[in-house]
Amino acid sequence: MRIGNLNVEIEFIADNIVRVLYYYGREAIVDNSLVVLPNLEKLSIKGESTGPSIISFSSESLSVDINTSNGELIMKDNKGGIVVKEKRRDLKFNEELSTYNVEQEFELSEGERVYGLGQHAGGNGLGQSSAYKLDYSGLSTTLSQRNTDIGIPFIVSSKGYGILWDNYSLGSISLRRNKLKVWFEAGKKIDYYVIYGDSIDDVIKGYRKLTGDAPLLPKWAYGYWQSKERYKSQDEITSVVKEFRERKIPLDVIVLDWRYWGKYGWNAFKFDETDFPRPKDMVEEIHKMGAKLAISIWPTFGKETEVFKDMESKGCIILGTTAFNPFKDECRELFWSYVKGFYDLGIDAYWLDASEPETGLGLVFFSPIHDVDLEIGKGYEYLNAYPLMETKAVYEGQRRISNKRVVILTRSAFAGQQRHSAISWSGDVLGDWATLRAQIPAGLNFSISGIPYWTTDTGGFFSGNPETKAYAEIFVRWFQWSTFCPILRVHGTIFPKEPWRFPREYQEVILKYIRLRYKLLPYIYSLAWMTYSIGYTIMRPLVMDFRDDQNVYDFDEQYMFGPYILISPVTLPSIIEKEVYLPSKEYWYDFWTGEKLEGGRMMDVKVTLDTIPLFVRSGAVLPLLGKNVNNAEEYWDVIDLRVYPGKNGYFELYDDDGITYEYEKGKYYIIPITWDEDKQELTIGKKRGELEMSKKIIKIIWVEKGKGIEHTKPDVEIEYNGKETITVKRG
């Protein structure tokens, strides 16, 4: 079938997922997608003539109508409502690059909002602007990989659909006057997928069906990460962990930043013995103290290093750079062979820094890779997919040899990267109030782009002196917010930012939130299971849960952490109250006081240095850790189960061994918990799953005014072994 000069093909991957493909010539160019999984099943749906110049394709959920006369493509839901309207498209030949530029235009509905596209906040002082907006109305956004800027060609609409473009080149998305204009620098075809759902969760689930699930990280990855640029010796880094333990501050991960290679040259995959004389002993000492070690690794190498010479001799260095080529199978395997040396030492996580890649050369958008022949194709065709392929090298490398879960921290990302156990962070941002505000919509857009694990340099990379109250306040507010991010991590340059570096009153607040993070771990880990098993999103723009309430569409500084907790971070200095919107058709509980409040309104919430506005949805059954721990791996044998009455509620408490991939084989357990509002009964069902479970003490608290989060005296205490159902009546 043709529209103008272009051939068009329509494929249904599922009832609610449609692929649209435009190309010149008789047959589509067949190549292996880097993003979309291979061998996806397709529905057998053929086009039918349904009117003059109209060809239609229909499933139970969607119909696609193509007007071969005027070129319009319209997708409708099963009630006839318009989902997507593509007005035009073009493949324009670019003589300079000898390829085609991709151009498209979509017509949006009045009031429709668009989210996603990765992370675009700036705030690093390198010329990028900080945008505080969550939706992209009135903006033009460049899709490229830069420090603090992550380009992902996936949008999500407030109407309940998403569009994923299978294109890896430099791109631009412009949204003005209800028109969405799309441009990519290079493409032999136009290739995109529309995903529709009853909810935005359905859209993200469809995105993961196309691009892969997000594996569970090990349990310790959801605890507290301490980092700085940099710990300069073996003695220094082990002494920091020791001090955490002596001060009884929970800690799971300590991070070793760059330059540990010393005399061996840039990123040599070796430790300089002057400062790191016994690296294996260092790792073992950290492990004995109940912590894990992450290490910085770069995609570039000093020309004097053995690894560079080896890579170059095997054709694995990209011409004109010192970066390895992750688009070649043998080069990914070679890169992993060097990373494996760290794995063999017992190192637990890999920090793949500057994975754009930052080469130290080139202009803002056009790195030296842009014009190079990568063998798979021209650099400009594959530019944005570099971090996807670098993380693939490490993830697949470790999975081939080990059942131990992979953990990758990386500065850049691309569509599909969630399948590589990759956590992204927002880059080298400034440590000021404006940048803090910008991080929130940046993280929300990244999360709704389908990649669930995200964090920041808490307090900013370029930060102030922790001994000053002005900076200490910024850090505390940032830390409070980071407690409710998928990953909690502190990092920065010049000044160390361990909790004890701050004035006493600020230090106490930091410790309060570290302990709160650990109380939340049973909830967070259960959300991680949902992320893997049903395509869930942990850090959630309000539009995901309250799409019927149009008031929430533009809230840049409020979001849901899982299904229950509403967060409104404090992002201005010295304030004593903050205006917060509680979504409609809900009752809410003040997290700190237990007071029940009606939704559908704005309200002024008082804040102190040690509190931010936090609210819990009625119907929540919130499982918290009921004891103090040093790290996330200690057994969760005491659970505080907080019940927030007001409507029916259900939650599944999940656990497994926390270390291996045995959960993929059913080695886990789930505890189903149900709150019946009419009967005022809590039912804890028999555990499901193949993993054996030791008994737990469950302390039940019926939340009401005066029973905020710091109220820990249970109303009912039960012993639970998972073998029988227990029902508890509220007294």
Curated annotation (Swiss-Prot):
What pH-dependence text does the entry carry?
Answer: Optimum pH is 5.5.
What biological-process GO terms show up in the record? Answer: carbohydrate metabolic process
Residue intervals passing through the bilayer: none
Q: Does the keyword Ligase apply?
A: no
**Which Pfam families does its entry note?**
DUF5110, Gal_mutarotas_2, Glyco_hydro_31_2nd, Glyco_hydro_31_3rd
Q: Which residues form the active site?
A: 353, 356, 428
Q: Which InterPro entries match?
A: DUF5110, Gal_mutarotase_sf_dom, Glyco_hydro_31_C, Glyco_hydro_31_N_dom, Glyco_hydro_31_TIM, Glyco_hydro_b, Glycoside_hydrolase_SF, Glycosyl_Hydrolase_31
MF-aspect GO terms: alpha-D-xyloside xylohydrolase; carbohydrate binding
- For this protein, the Enzyme Commission number is 3.2.1.177
What keywords appear on the UniProt entry?
Answer: Glycosidase, Hydrolase
Outline the temperature dependence of activity: Optimum temperature is 90 degrees Celsius.
Query: Per the record, what are the reactions this protein catalyses?
Result: Hydrolysis of terminal, non-reducing alpha-D-xylose residues with release of alpha-D-xylose
Protein purpose: Catalyzes the liberation of alpha-xylose from the non-reducing terminal glucose of xyloglucan oligosaccharides. Has high hydrolytic activity on the disaccharide isoprimeverose. Follows a retaining mechanism of substrate hydrolysis.
Please state which protein family the record places this protein in: Belongs to the glycosyl hydrolase 31 family.
- Subunit arrangement? Monomer.
The protein's name: Alpha-xylosidase
